[in-house]
Amino acid sequence: MRYIKSITQQKLSFLLAIYIGLFMNGAVFYRRFGSYAHDFTVWKGISAVVELAATVLVTFFLLRLLSLFGRRSWRILASLVVLFSAGASYYMTFLNVVIGYGIIASVMTTDIDLSKEVVGLNFILWLIAVSALPLILIWNNRCRYTLLRQLRTPGQRIRSLAVVVLAGIMVWAPIRLLDIQQKKVERATGVDLPSYGGVVANSYLPSNWLSALGLYAWARVDESSDNNSLLNPAKKFTYQAPQNVDDTYVVFIIGETTRWDHMGIFGYERNTTPKLAQEKNLAAFRGYSCDTATKLSLRCMFVRQGGAEDNPQRTLKEQNIFAVLKQLGFSSDLYAMQSEMWFYSNTMADNIAYREQIGAEPRNRGKPVDDMLLVDEMQQSLGRNPDGKHLIILHTKGSHFNYTQRYPRSFAQWKPECIGVDSGCTKAQMINSYDNSVTYVDHFISSVIDQVRDKKAIVFYAADHGESINEREHLHGTPRELAPPEQFRVPMMVWMSDKYLENPANAQAFAQLKKEADMKVPRRHVELYDTIMGCLGYTSPDGGINENNNWCHIPQAKEAAAN
């Protein structure tokens, strides 16, 4: 006991770091490295050593930084780190849970009864047993020489600060080197993998729950700020729900860089959409995006017309359709192969999982960052919400460059392909790879539809922008005033299940959609808000839905008046 009292705060931090970093992460180490014995390589061995060291050093780095608040505050904060990590380790060990935004959001719910349902006697016993030793160390130690004390003491400043900085560098540098090595493998194989550092951060204590907690806090602050600054259509307008919406599933697929003039269903010479061509309940439109870059389009494509400024940065003025549906009683989950966190938080989704977090799931470890991973997440979401009135948002990588990385080898139908970023591909090679990626988009959308084919469901798809693929111009993101037309060409689709069409009003709305699609009526991003509301059957007596933008609007009354 005397030794415990006498050791410095720095030594105690290191002992705690070993306990939290190694012992509490034991189950994760076993799952991540258990298969290495059967398929061992030097790089796998190096990554195992790096991750073991990183979990210890990042915890040490954190505990030393917390000592900047002084002895008393450090004891409290360090105790919280131990307790939170011990609690998280229970679910990671016995339930194989990946601690991410969704878990933190669930823990932070105001519905205490629901939170208590996942806390049993075994959890309490584990929490006590695992946290007892480190808590005894923390509260029986004198906490001599905190970082705050050392920085105030001449002769100790440089050395104490250097130790902390060195710990941070020893975490960052090896992980960065392994990330670079992984990128080389990606370029050589054409396989897209999640960020190595991101997966590590989302896999281990305490960085997983700390990053998720930070994301949750940022989302709450951002949401609160937006609630105060953005116009809320759900409060400004009256939305009247149809009688049969409570058992409905809504899925919105946000496409990436896919062009309608490279899709077979729109008359393209190559059959890039064989599966969608077989969907009888699909209405597909030649669409035009509101901008030419993902971040900009996400600002303007899901708000009411005029809900984003017409300035270069597309300043938001109103809340988006997903936030409105949330306020109208829909539960919602968002799964993304991208990382536009500002947009994801603005949807007010109950659960958000982005690419690194999805890649850290045990079932996905070692797999490419493939849009099909979102289908697995969607299955989980549907299973958790068996009663309907549920929204699922899927943000894909679609046909984003490098096109060849967007699809597995089995979809390499057109060759030669464009391999690598710096390979100086010809236009024909780029088009071959791009068209292969479109075929995989077709496969993905069809797979999503399969998940809700037997449910009362409606599925929307819209790509965020188009792409230039020619000798003069490549990619996208050209300022919209100067952008060529192909950067605005996006497919937009609506699919309704047979059960959804059993309702006469929905069947009538779909007939209108098919009529407009057959007439090749062009559609725009700015019509999505009103279309989603209208196709779900919502009405607004005070202007909350612009019927001119509602694709499902039946213009009978207008035609009668004209006659």
UniProtKB/Swiss-Prot annotation:
Localization, UniProt: Cell inner membrane
Activity control note: Inhibited by calcium concentrations higher than 1 mM.
MF-aspect GO terms: phosphatidylethanolamine:Kdo2-lipid A phosphoethanolamine transferase activity
Annotated GO CC locations: plasma membrane
Gene3D superfamilies named in the record: Alkaline Phosphatase, subunit A
The enzyme's E.C. designation: 2.7.8.42
Signal sequence region: none
Pfam families in alphabetical order: EptA_B_N (PF08019), Sulfatase (PF00884)
Cofactor(s) annotated in UniProt: Ca(2+)
Keyword hit for DNA repair: no
Main location: membrane
Keyword field contains Ribonucleoprotein: no
Catalysis performed (reactions): alpha-Kdo-(2->4)-alpha-Kdo-(2->6)-lipid A (E. coli) + a 1,2-diacyl-sn-glycero-3-phosphoethanolamine = 7-O-[2-aminoethoxy(hydroxy)phosphoryl]-alpha-Kdo-(2->4)-alpha-Kdo-(2->6)-lipid A + a 1,2-diacyl-sn-glycerol; alpha-Kdo-(2->4)-alpha-Kdo-(2->6)-lipid IVA (E. coli) + a 1,2-diacyl-sn-glycero-3-phosphoethanolamine = 7-O-[2-aminoethoxy(hydroxy)phosphoryl]-alpha-Kdo-(2->4)-alpha-Kdo-(2->6)-lipid IVA (E. coli) + a 1,2-diacyl-sn-glycerol
Family: Belongs to the phosphoethanolamine transferase family. EptB subfamily.
Annotated function: Catalyzes the addition of a phosphoethanolamine (pEtN) moiety to the outer 3-deoxy-D-manno-octulosonic acid (Kdo) residue of a Kdo(2)-lipid A. Phosphatidylethanolamines with one unsaturated acyl group function as pEtN donors and the reaction releases diacylglycerol.
Protein name, entry field: Kdo(2)-lipid A phosphoethanolamine 7''-transferase
Gene coding for it: eptB
